Design a protein with these regions (language model features):
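Helix-loop-strand module that forms the ligand-binding subsite of alpha/beta enzymes
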Residues: 1-61
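Glycine-rich phosphate/pyrophosphate-binding loop and the adjoining helix
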Residues: 47-141
Length: 141
């Protein structure tokens, strides 16, 4: 996927110095990542052995926002076992897989009502490109 981003989202084509973030080519359009992971959800939590899923997906979300997309919270399905690795019996896995599919089918009709992941935009920075002192995210610095 990284290679695709590098080849398709090229400077001068879909973004430029002034056509980025909330002024990007895809402003007004929505994107969302859908991901499956073989390990259980706990493995992708902060301090989990697989690493925090939010941090895994940050480069993709940031790249999508960079060219103007509003990015929705991802659809992540954990514990989708395969490749010989099993965390539970086949029957239990199949039942959980059907539940995941039903939850996804339930979410699809509501996607247009979901708020995007908050990112900073052009009006949030000063003339030097630094987050404004009064911005709510400033506490993180």
């Amino acid at each position: 996927l990284k290679g695709w981003f590098d080849r398709v989202l090229v400077y001068g084509g879909l973004y430029s110095g002034s056509r980025r973030y909330n002024r990007g080519h895809f402003r007004g359009k929505t994107a969302m990542c859908s991901v499956t992971a073989g390990s259980p959800e706990q493995a992708f939590m902060p301090f989990g052995r697989a690493g925090n899923m939010v941090e895994w997906l940050w480069p993709m979300h940031a790249s999508l926002y960079y060219v103007g997309f509003d990015v929705l919270v991802p659809q992540v399905s954990y514990g989708v076992q395969g490749g010989g690795i099993r965390y539970q019996g086949e029957g239990t896995f199949r039942k959980q897989l059907e539940q995941k599919k039903a939850a996804w089918a339930e979410r699809i009709p509501t996607l247009s009502c979901e708020p995007p992941i908050p990112f900073t935009g052009w009006d949030d920075w000063d003339e030097k490109g630094v987050l404004r002192q009064d911005h709510p995210m400033r506490w993180r610095l």
